[in-house]
């Protein structure tokens, strides 16, 4: 069997030989030793051993084959695992690399966005490039995976039970058998497919999770955005409501949108007036009804939402407001007399006013309300004009009440509005609103007249009456008890308008009464009358042709309580300051709209609207810049808000007649205007004697508007009045009753009360004015028939003497017109009265008619003009010792106001007068104050008669010097502002002529004037020029020319005085001053030639002048 194999044969042979040798040897030994030999047993053993060896060899070979197969399997498995591990590592590295790239890309994109935002921060949002969020483009492998995922979406969308389940354990257990049976390539493909499926499933799950998360995030973001938008809308709505209820001016909600304020409760039609006449137009009710909607044709006016808001606030409590009367019903009544007030301004005014006020009166005892519906009508210039207005006025002999009814289309707030009237050919129109009703009720109850309380409750009064030249002139007729009526005043500083602490003092302010506030110049003149006797009433009855309708009013205390309760009940929140101050306004009184001076009505768009009462929003180039407030060192703590600045428009002058204007005093900074009414008090003699003299000349002279005014102010527009440095004491303020009955006034003369004394004279001669203050009375008679005219101030009595005037020498020269003013700065701002003209705390601008001093010259009234010097009471004792002099000059209008330490305030203004009208002023000592006024008058008259001869020669000398100075100044620089200013200074210095018996007062007065005009006036002139938007170069040239011109002043002033009366020391001082002035003139010329040293040397002349003055004062002492 094994013979065929060589290996076996050799093995067996070797084994057989070996065994045979061994066998042979083994038995040979015994055989040799004598044993027996057996050959058969030897062969059998040999065969048996070979068989066993062959079996063992086969087993070993089989085991070797199995081990080789196992090693091969393990090797393959190890190689597969290595490859799988390598692939996984590569995939992880790729994933990490992709993640890194993605993060870096995001960071790079964010960095680019931030840099772009930073670089384009100056570019507006509309022009910026919007960053578009673009999805990153996936690489090719990810795109293939996404395609495979999209193919397997059907499998993913199947339910979980129907999905093909893969038993991974069975696959792993079957792997060894499969590997042993199948080829290596088949195994590799199977494993790759399984891994691919695993990854795809994992990716699908991840994408589902991420898509769910993204969807949830987007949903949450949209919800948050919607919530934020809703909240923002709610917040905006709440802010608008709060702005409506809490705004300082209820009708200025769209204050930044100036175009929406063309109509605010009064339609105003701009018409250029080429004539001076202000005529009263009387229309029939049919004509009124035919034009009642004409206002809506102007600029397509529509009632703004401010009107609806105010109407809503007005109608919060319908039970406390009067029933709405249909406008047609009111017009259809027989007792309604509609009259139209036609307001035209002069040609210089760009915004004339056409206001329509309908008046309804009843002759019976029933109180028919006056219906005022300005928004409904526009008066056309072509309407009928009447020359007589006395025939159109009806009176209510017993009682009447004015109220403002709601118009036809929209309901405007109720408002106590007085009738406004104008006389034919009158140059000033008047609109008045009634002040506090309680004082009327007190007056009515004292006089026993019937009073009817009204339940009209004005919640807000956005009535706006911007007027150009208007004033209120209520007058008396028959036995009607006339009450004191103040005009509507304009004030932006309403925190000053506080009620007085005493019940007697009823201030007319916006806290107590809802009033239209006028920011334009609004001319006021009042003739309040309180007749006491039958004779006075009879004389008043004689002048009934000029009297106007006046009704009695009784608004008792329940009116104020009712307003307060309505506001508290309806939850109206009251005004607070935008400047985060404490609210100084009482509850229950809302304020009206403040309209800036540049607010234009009618066909013009609104140029600017005052956004707030305390915070002014300037819009447009025509609005003046913020006026800097001068703070004097002797101001008390609460007097910062009283820097007066008068703004009034220039009136057209007729052939010979001067027309009055309102004197405005500006309070605080930011063009805050407090229009100050002229002063008048209940006096029976005033109306009686006044109307006796002018009742026949109203229509012929065309000056009825001015005839009724006891006090007129010739103060031009832009006239700046310096701030008073002397405050009134609190005790005096608290003791001054504003309105009092004439009977109680006789028994209890009040300090600080203003009285009017009028004497019968010609129609153009104004009556005298007495204002009693702390230490005496300021008496300014304005009668041509009286020469004993004197003005008393603290320590001085200034008497203007009549100049000799000739009608042939009249030219358009310059005249100085002076207004009397009293200190307006009390210590307590709550006691400031801006709407009361019956108090010494109030500025009382009085117009002095310049045709008074005619007795010597006996020239016609039209040509008779003179100069007056007004003296203002001196400072109180606690601040008069260290008060600095000050002045505020407005050069653009040719006016000047100079206040001195010796308590004399000179307000000068130029107007066409006679060339030779140069009055002389005689100063009286303070000892004459102890003499009673009725004794002092004749004495002054007698002294004036004695001093007449000596003043004539002096006047001639001064006239010659003044002419020479004016001619020299005109030759040098006739058109410059500085020239006009120096001319004013020269004329002003020459106008103050002093008697030869008081040489010390002469030199002292002129030195003070010169002091004021040097330092402070330069600063004020520069400030005015800056405010007028003059370039810096022109300002510097004006200042230099003014300083050069002022060098001539000492020479001019030394010529004015009688040198013989001066002592030798004074003559030396004057000579030294002349030398110094020449040196200063040389320095000024050098500075003008070398502008580089202008800034360093410009202060030197002022310092040198001050040093010279101080040295001269020391030498005098």
Swiss-Prot record:
Alphabetical UniProt keywords: Cell projection, Cilium biogenesis/degradation, Coiled coil, Cytoplasm, Cytoskeleton
Tissue-specificity statement: Expressed in brain, lung, skeletal muscle, kidney, pancreas, testis and ovary.
A cellular-component GO term for this protein: ciliary base
Name of the protein in question: Centrosomal protein of 126 kDa
Coiled coil: 49-121
Predominant location category: other
Classification via Pfam families: K1377
Species assigned in the record: Homo sapiens
Record note on quaternary structure: Interacts with DCTN1.
Keyword set includes Cytoplasm: yes
């Amino acid at each position: 069997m094994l013979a065929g194999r060589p290996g076996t044969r050799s093995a067996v042979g070797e084994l057989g030989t070996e065994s045979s040798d061994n066998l042979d040897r083994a038995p040979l030994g015994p055989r040799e030793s004598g044993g027996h030999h057996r050959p058969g047993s030897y062969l059998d053993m040999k065969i048996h051993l070979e068989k066993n060896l062959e079996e063992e060899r086969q087993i070993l070979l089989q085991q070797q084959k199995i081990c080789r197969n196992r090693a091969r399997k393990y090797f393959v498995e190890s190689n597969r695992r290595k490859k799988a591990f390598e692939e996984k590592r590569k995939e992880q590295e790729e994933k990490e690399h992709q993640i890194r790239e993605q993060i870096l890309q995001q960071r790079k994109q964010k960095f680019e966005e931030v840099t772009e935002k930073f670089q384009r921060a100056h570019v507006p949002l509309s022009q910026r490039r919007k960053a578009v969020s673009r999805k990153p483009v996936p690489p090719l492998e990810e795109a293939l995976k996404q395609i495979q995922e999209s193919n397997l979406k059907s499998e993913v969308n199947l339910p979980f039970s129907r999905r093909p389940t893969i038993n991974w354990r069975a696959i792993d257990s079957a792997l060894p058998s499969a590997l042993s049976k199948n080829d290596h390539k088949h195994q590799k493909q199977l494993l790759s497919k399984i891994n691919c499926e695993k990854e795809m499933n994992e990716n699908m799950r991840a994408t589902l999770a991420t898509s769910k998360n993204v969807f949830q995030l987007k949903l949450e973001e949209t919800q948050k955005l919607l919530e934020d938008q809703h909240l923002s809308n709610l917040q905006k709505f709440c802010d608008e409501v709060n702005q409506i209820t809490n705004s300082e001016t209820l009708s200025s909600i769209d204050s930044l949108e100036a175009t929406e304020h063309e109509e605010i409760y009064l339609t105003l039609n701009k018409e250029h007036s080429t004539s001076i006449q202000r005529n009263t137009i009387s229309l029939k009710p049919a004509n009124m009804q035919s034009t009642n909607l004409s206002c809506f044709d102007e600029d397509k006016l529509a009632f703004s939402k401010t009107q609806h808001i105010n109407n809503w606030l007005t109608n919060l409590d319908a039970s406390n407001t009067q029933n709405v009367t249909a406008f047609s019903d009111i017009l259809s009544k027989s007792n309604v007399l509609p009259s139209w007030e036609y307001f035209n301004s002069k040609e210089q005014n760009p915004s004339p006013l056409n206001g329509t006020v309908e008046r309804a009166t009843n002759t019976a005892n029933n109180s028919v309300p006056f219906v005022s519906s300005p928004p409904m009508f526009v008066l056309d210039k072509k309407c009928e004009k009447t020359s007589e207005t006395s025939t159109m006025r009806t009176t209510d002999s017993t009682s009447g009440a004015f109220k403002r009814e709601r118009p036809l289309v929209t309901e405007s707030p109720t408002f106590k509005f007085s009738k406004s009237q104008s006389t034919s050919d009158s140059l000033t129109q008047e609109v008045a609103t009634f002040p506090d009703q309680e004082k009327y009720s007190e007056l009515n109850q004292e006089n026993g007249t019937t009073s009817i309380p009204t339940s009209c409750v004005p919640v807000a009064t956005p009535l706006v009456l911007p007027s150009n030249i208007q004033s209120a002139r209520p007058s008396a007729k028959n036995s009607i008890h006339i009450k004191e009526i103040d005009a509507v005043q304009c004030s932006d500083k309403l925190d000053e308008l506080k009620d007085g602490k005493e019940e007697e003092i009823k201030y007319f302010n916006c806290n107590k009464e809802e009033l239209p506030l006028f920011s334009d110049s609004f001319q006021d003149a009042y003739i309040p009358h309180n007749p006491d006797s039958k004779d006075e009433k009879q004389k008043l009855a004689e002048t009934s042709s000029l009297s106007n309708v006046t009704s009695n009013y009784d608004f008792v205390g329940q009116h104020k309580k009712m307003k307060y309760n309505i506001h508290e009940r309806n939850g109206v929140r009251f005004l607070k300051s935008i400047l985060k101050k404490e609210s100084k306004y009482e509850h229950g009184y809302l304020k009206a709209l403040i309209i800036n001076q540049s607010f234009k009505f009618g066909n013009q768009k609104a140029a600017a609207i005052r956004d707030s009462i305390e915070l002014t929003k300037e819009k447009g180039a025509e609005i003046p810049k913020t006026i800097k407030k001068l703070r004097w060192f002797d101001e008390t703590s609460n007097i910062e808000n009283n820097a007066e600045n008068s703004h009034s428009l220039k009136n057209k002058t007729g052939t010979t007649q001067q027309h009055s204007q309102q004197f405005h005093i500006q309070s605080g900074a930011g063009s805050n205007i407090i229009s100050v009414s002229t002063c008048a008090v209940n006096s029976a003699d005033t109306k009686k004697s006044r109307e006796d003299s002018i009742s026949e000349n109203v229509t012929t002279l065309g000056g009825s508007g001015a005839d009724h005014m006891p006090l007129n102010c010739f103060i031009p527009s832009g006239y700046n009045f310096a701030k008073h440095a002397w405050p009134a004491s609190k005790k005096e303020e608290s003791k001054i009753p504003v309105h009092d009955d004439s009977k109680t006034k006789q028994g209890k003369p009040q300090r600080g009360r203003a009285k009017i004394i009028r004497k019968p004279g010609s129609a153009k001669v104004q009556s005298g004015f007495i204002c009693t203050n702390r230490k005496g009375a300021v008496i300014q008679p304005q009668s041509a028939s009286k020469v004993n005219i004197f003005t008393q101030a603290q320590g001085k009595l200034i008497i203007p003497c009549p100049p000799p005037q000739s009608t042939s020498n009249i030219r358009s020269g310059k005249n100085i017109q002076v207004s009397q003013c009293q200190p307006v700065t009390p210590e307590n701002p709550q006691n400031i009265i801006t709407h009361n003209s019956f108090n010494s705390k109030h500025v009382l601008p009085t117009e002095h008619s310049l045709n008074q001093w005619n007795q010597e010259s006996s020239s016609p009234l039209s040509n008779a003009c003179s100069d007056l010097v007004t003296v203002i009471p001196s400072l109180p004792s606690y601040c008069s010792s260290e008060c600095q002099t000050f002045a505020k000059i407005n050069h653009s209008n040719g006016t000047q106001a100079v206040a001195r330490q010796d308590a004399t305030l000179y307000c000068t203004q130029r107007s066409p007068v006679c060339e030779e009208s140069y009055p002389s002023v005689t100063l009286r000592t303070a000892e004459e104050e102890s003499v009673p006024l009725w004794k002092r008058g004749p004495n002054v008259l007698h002294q004036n008669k004695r001093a007449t001869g000596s003043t004539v020669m002096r006047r001639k000398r001064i006239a010659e010097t003044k002419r020479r100075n004016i001619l020299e100044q005109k030759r040098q620089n006739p058109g410059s502002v500085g020239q006009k200013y120096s001319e004013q200074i020269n004329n002003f210095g020459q106008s103050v002529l002093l008697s030869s018996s008081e040489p010390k007062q002469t030199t002292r007065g002129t030195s003070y004037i010169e002091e004021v005009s040097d330092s402070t006036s330069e600063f004020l002139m520069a400030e005015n020029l800056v405010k007028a938007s003059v370039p810096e170069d022109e300002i510097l040239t004006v200042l230099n020319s003014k300083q050069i011109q002022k060098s001539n002043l000492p020479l001019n002033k030394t010529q004015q005085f009688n040198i013989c009366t001066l002592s030798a020391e004074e003559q030396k001082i004057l000579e030294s001053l002349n030398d110094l002035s020449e040196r200063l003139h040389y320095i000024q010329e050098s500075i003008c030639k070398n502008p580089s040293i202008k800034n360093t040397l410009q202060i030197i002349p002022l310092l040198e002048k001050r040093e010279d003055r101080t040295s001269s004062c020391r030498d005098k002492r």
